Amino acid sequence: MKLSGLYLVTKDYYNGNFFNIVEESLSAGVNILQYRDKTNPYNIKIEAGRRLKNLAYKYNVPFIVDDSPVLLDILDADGIHIGKDDPPFEYIKERFPGKIIGVSTYGDINLGIKYERLGADYIAFGSFFKTSTKDDAEMCDINILNNASKFNIPVFAIGGINTRNVDELLKYKISGIAVVSAIFDAANPGEATRTFLEKLRKIL
């Protein structure tokens, strides 16, 4: 399963155009979909997650859940993304063999090295720009991406990325970018997706 390109991370589920935005971006070419929801109760997350998984599979892209082994299990998602305050990598690796495990490595190259050795399927450095998605996001020096080519697993950039600043990241040998607001808050999510993909052709 290829892990590269444009990685869409959702906002928390909400009533309204949530699924329309996701499908519009998937139909425009998003390569990976992650369901990230920090606020809703599990019954809502499960219901929304099932619909998102169906959409991801409709467009033949991997479906990842954020930080929850419970959702990974119930939804039988393709994988999970974890950070420093989430369940331990080793537990997830043992409990869910064969699942994709992605790890946030912030601005710490040694974390990236550690998790590659432990068997992570991809890592994500960031935040590179101010982001409204995560108020307490640690800012990351863009020069860390000079090390991207040293890894044998995909390296993603994340955090405050939009169609105006993404070119700064594409100078480096990354595998892709992860975005939230740049698509969810776009006037035209499909057009924003296509703009990102056109720029990503430089590295794909």
From Swiss-Prot:
NCBIfam families: thiE (TIGR00693)
Reactions listed under catalytic activity: 2-[(2R,5Z)-2-carboxy-4-methylthiazol-5(2H)-ylidene]ethyl phosphate + 4-amino-2-methyl-5-(diphosphooxymethyl)pyrimidine + 2 H(+) = thiamine phosphate + CO2 + diphosphate; 2-(2-carboxy-4-methylthiazol-5-yl)ethyl phosphate + 4-amino-2-methyl-5-(diphosphooxymethyl)pyrimidine + 2 H(+) = thiamine phosphate + CO2 + diphosphate; 4-methyl-5-(2-phosphooxyethyl)-thiazole + 4-amino-2-methyl-5-(diphosphooxymethyl)pyrimidine + H(+) = thiamine phosphate + diphosphate
Alphabetized Pfam families for the sequence: TMP-TENI
Requisite cofactors: Mg(2+)
Any one GO CC term of the record: cytoplasm
Annotated GO biological process: thiamine biosynthetic process; thiamine diphosphate biosynthetic process
Family matches, as InterPro entries: Aldolase_TIM, ThiamineP_synth_sf, ThiamineP_synth_TenI, TMP_synthase
Protein's name according to its UniProt entry: Thiamine-phosphate synthase
Record's function text: Condenses 4-methyl-5-(beta-hydroxyethyl)thiazole monophosphate (THZ-P) and 2-methyl-4-amino-5-hydroxymethyl pyrimidine pyrophosphate (HMP-PP) to form thiamine monophosphate (TMP).
Co-factor: note: Binds 1 Mg(2+) ion per subunit.
Domain of life: Archaea
Positions annotated to bind Mg(2+): 67, 86
Residues noted as binding 2-[(2R,5Z)-2-carboxy-4-methylthiazol-5(2H)-ylidene]ethyl phosphate in the record, renumbered to the chain: 131-133, 160, 180-181
Species: Picrophilus torridus (strain ATCC 700027 / DSM 9790 / JCM 10055 / NBRC 100828 / KAW 2/3)
Pathway entry: Cofactor biosynthesis; thiamine diphosphate biosynthesis; thiamine phosphate from 4-amino-2-methyl-5-diphosphomethylpyrimidine and 4-methyl-5-(2-phosphoethyl)-thiazole: step 1/1
